[in-house]
Amino acid sequence: MERTFVILKPNAVRRGLVGEILKRFEQRGIKIVGLKFLKMTREQAEKLYEPHKGKQFYDELLEFMLSGPIVAVILEAPRCLELVRHIVGATDPLKAEAGSIRGEFALTVTKNLIHASDSTDNFIRESSIFFSPSEIIDYYLDVQDDI
């Protein structure tokens, strides 16, 4: 099994889309093994987006991520990283596939509802900002045999 990390951004929370987004993952057989509702600290935001420091959009992105609560999630499934990125859609909502989360609901590149890790290394780095190993729960889905 493979894992990945996503953050439902402040606009996903404010627009009442948390349940809809999580449902899309669960309907595909993706298991939620970590889930937190929180207000991101500046330190967490700076660590998360450290690779983008110095880029034109960095300050705006940080301020947006600090503007309200977020939902941090660790997901698990076979080929999880690839599957989640397909469900999420392209970063730019105008380039996102119809039916993807961003293609259906996102407004702008910054306010695109969801952050998703783009590699296993980034999953490890990003998820460790929000979760300790003891906060990741392993369990068996009733439908797991069908996946």
Curated annotation (Swiss-Prot):
Quote the SUPFAM superfamilies the UniProt record gives.
Nucleoside diphosphate kinase, NDK
Q: Which domain of life is it from?
A: Bacteria
Question: Per the UniProt record, which residue ranges are transmembrane?
Answer: none
Gene3D superfamilies referenced in this protein's UniProt entry, alphabetically: Nucleoside diphosphate kinase-like domain
List the catalytic residues.
Answer: 115
Protein role:
Major role in the synthesis of nucleoside triphosphates other than ATP. The ATP gamma phosphate is transferred to the NDP beta phosphate via a ping-pong mechanism, using a phosphorylated active-site intermediate.
Q: What is this protein called?
A: Nucleoside diphosphate kinase
Species whose genome carries this gene: Fervidobacterium nodosum (strain ATCC 35602 / DSM 5306 / Rt17-B1)
